[in-house]
Every structure is written in structure tokens, then in C-alpha cells.
Regions:
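Ordered alpha/beta subdomains of enzyme catalytic regions
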Residues: 8, 19-239
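Low-acidity, Ser/Thr- and Arg-rich intrinsically disordered low-complexity segments
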Residues: 2-3, 7-9, 13-17
């Protein structure tokens, strides 16, 4: 059976290429597609950057204040639990545009008529605004700001997508975990969601958010190692 498995070839497709990976010979170059401090600068929607280009070209870089909040609570939900702030702050403190990603952006057709000064600006970019936020684990309600950012228009626009993604997801998971914990009525609730998560990184963030929401442990070993959450597990059903 093992020799049969070793002959299996995995095929991945992208818009520009087809890579055949021979699992036995270890050829090809599969990409892990994980976020890191280098590539998170372009972990955003393109329209955020086209708006930044518009602001820059027109000199629209005055100080502005943006608030992240939930307009309406989901049906049969009376509250949410704020989560994701630590990762949002890490992003703001470490956000930089490296030469590799600036070249990629500069070569995009949508930026062909943009002045080169914009990319000089982005090369020196760092977040210099002010952030006000409720602590993680705080009960929040509709129309109540989770995070308030005061910064230049360009800075605030660049960070919108990442902050929304990070805060929305972890707040969603922490809120659900809190409801389950309350329903358990004093019995311990454990996060076993990694295998059902939308990818390994989502599983890691979910384990963190579950702990904020009141879970007593996680099956995710990486989350336990990185965050100090008690690791819990026995054996699978197949045992």
C-alpha cells in the first residue's frame, strides 16, 4: 500500500502555470500560502490600494477617524465577544512594504499611470495613527465601536481589510464559544474545531478565540504551545 501511495502525483493549478509534484522524488514547489510579516502588506483588497493611489494623487491625506462596529446582531444573539485585537496590533506595528511587493504592485496595469512618488511613500510607510479598542473578551453590542482608528486617510485605508478580517473572524468564534460555554452550565467546553476549520491558520485563530470565549482547552497543539492553552485529547473514533 505504501508503494502505491508513493506513486501518487498531486497536481495543482494556478492562473499561470500547472505544477506536477512527484511525491516520491519530491520535485516541484508547492506553496504553503501562510501569512507572515513580509507578505501581510498585500493581504488586502486591491480597491484599498487603488483608493490610496487616488488619495495620494489628489493630496487627500488629512487626519480621519474610522470605527469598526457591528450594525446589527445576528438573529437570536444578544451580545458578541470582542476578539482579535492582539493580532490586529501586531499587524499595525509590523506593517511594511518590501521591495518585492512594491515591484509587484508597480507592475500591475491598474497602477500604470500612478506617479512613482506613491511607491516611494509606501517604501517608507509605517502606521503612525492612534488606536482605541475594547479589551479582548469584552461583551459588545450593536453599533458599539470595537476599534477606533485615528490616522491619515491613506494609513486608515490601507489597514481596513486586514483589521476587518482579523477582528470579524475571531469575534465570531469567541461569541459562539461563549454561548456554548453558557449553555454547558459549568461543565468544561473544549475546542476540537481545527479539523473543521477553514485551513490551519483559521484553526489556530479559532482555538485562541474559543479560549477567550470561555473554553477550557484545545485539541490544537500549536495553539496550546504558542498561547499556553491547555492541550486536551484522547484518541480518535478509529482507535
Amino acid at each position: 500500500a505504501s508503494s502505491v501511495m508513493m506513486r501518487i502525483k498531486a497536481v495543482t493549478r494556478s492562473l499561470h502555470s500547472k505544477i506536477t509534484i512527484d511525491m516520491k522524488k519530491n520535485t516541484g514547489k508547492p506553496e504553503p500560502l501562510f501569512l507572515n510579516d513580509a507578505n501581510m502588506c498585500i493581504s488586502t483588497d486591491l480597491y484599498q490600494l487603488t483608493m490610496v493611489a487616488g488619495y495620494f494623487e489628489r493630496g487627500m491625506d488629512h487626519k480621519s477617524t474610522f470605527e469598526l462596529f457591528v450594525r446589527n446582531l445576528p438573529e437570536r444573539r444578544s451580545y458578541l465577544i470582542a476578539a482579535g485585537l492582539e493580532q490586529a496590533i501586531h499587524y499595525l506595528k509590523n506593517l511594511r512594504f518590501t521591495a518585492e511587493y512594491l515591484k509587484y504592485l508597480k507592475d500591475l496595469p491598474v497602477f500604470k499611470n500612478v506617479s512613482r512618488e506613491l511607491f516611494d511613500y509606501l517604501r517608507e510607510f509605517y502606521f503612525s495613527g492612534d488606536v482605541y479598542a475594547v479589551p479582548e473578551g469584552t461583551v459588545i453590542f450593536a453599533n458599539e465601536p470595537i476599534i477606533r482608528v485615528t490616522a491619515s486617510m491613506i494609513e486608515a485605508q490601507i489597514i481596513e481589510t486586514y483589521l476587518l478580517s482579523m477582528i470579524n473572524y475571531q469575534t465570531l468564534i469567541a461569541s459562539k464559544a461563549s454561548r456554548v460555554v453558557h449553555a454547558a452550565d459549568g461543565r468544561g467546553v473544549i475546542d476540537f474545531g481545527t479539523r473543521r476549520a477553514h485551513g490551519p491558520h483559521a484553526g489556530l485563530l479559532a482555538a485562541r478565540a474559543c479560549f477567550i470565549g470561555g473554553c477550557v482547552g484545545t485539541s490544537n497543539v500549536l495553539a496550546a504551545y504558542e498561547l499556553g492553552i491547555p492541550p486536551i485529547g484522547t484518541v480518535a473514533h478509529s482507535w
